[in-house]
Amino acid sequence: MAKIIISLILLLSLFSFSYGAYNCNKLNCSSKNTKCRTFSCTSVVGCYYTDKCTSPDLCHNSACNASTGNCTLTTISCNDNNPCTDDFCHPGYGCYSVPNSCDPGVICQQNCNDNDPCTYDFCDALNICRHSETYCNDGDACTLNTCGVNGCNFTKISCDDNDPCTADYCSTLYGCYHEPIECSIKVPCNIDSDCNRNNGCETFTCNLSTNTCDYYAKNCGGWPCINNQCTTGSISN
């Protein structure tokens, strides 16, 4: 029990030493006073200062003139330079913005037309001109979409593959496709595999009597064959 009491006495002594260590008379904190700051002292923290000019809330800034000690209070600007927001200040929270109903293109103060028919010109919410590439797409896989001096151009593409054993078509959805038709090509062949052209849409045989490869359309159950495989739906040309 005696050991516990002695330990408590030592602990209290250390506490008193740690938190009562500053001698305010010796520190003479008031000698550090300026026209904008007043210094004080406690035995716990020593010297500390208080600013003469302080902001009353989060919507104002306070500044002190070091020469005169006069305080100047200014209002904080909450303008985010976005014409499509209304900007406010709450004394306890500071700046905040609320979206409004506006058309940045109407608010824009400058002409953003770059006279390029292949760009879409607009003014953003920060009053800055932007030019994005014109998206020329008619949704038709059978046309080549380009942009020129007159704007968007849509040119029909050729699906001719120069293969006498295919009929060439174009689907607005898939683009070009080539359906095998019955035909014969005079090429040397000894077995059927000699006629293999790696076309998944055709079948073939080797006619040994004529040394020709005979080709036929693959049976897809009435569905078209596109990109070397049977489709599961109809094709609109």
From Swiss-Prot:
Cys-rich CT repeats: 57-81, 82-105, 116-139, 140-162, 163-186
Residues bearing attached sugar chains per UniProt: N28, N65, N70, N153, N207
Pfam families: Dicty_CTDC
Positions of transmembrane segments: none
Superkingdom field: Eukaryota
Keyword terms: Developmental protein, Glycoprotein, Repeat, Signal, Stress response
Signal peptide range: 1-20
GO cellular component: extracellular matrix; extracellular region
Biological role stated in the UniProt entry: PDI acts by binding stoichiometrically to cyclic nucleotide phosphodiesterase, changing the KM of the enzyme for cAMP from 10 uM to 2 mM.
Protein known as: Cyclic nucleotide phosphodiesterase inhibitor
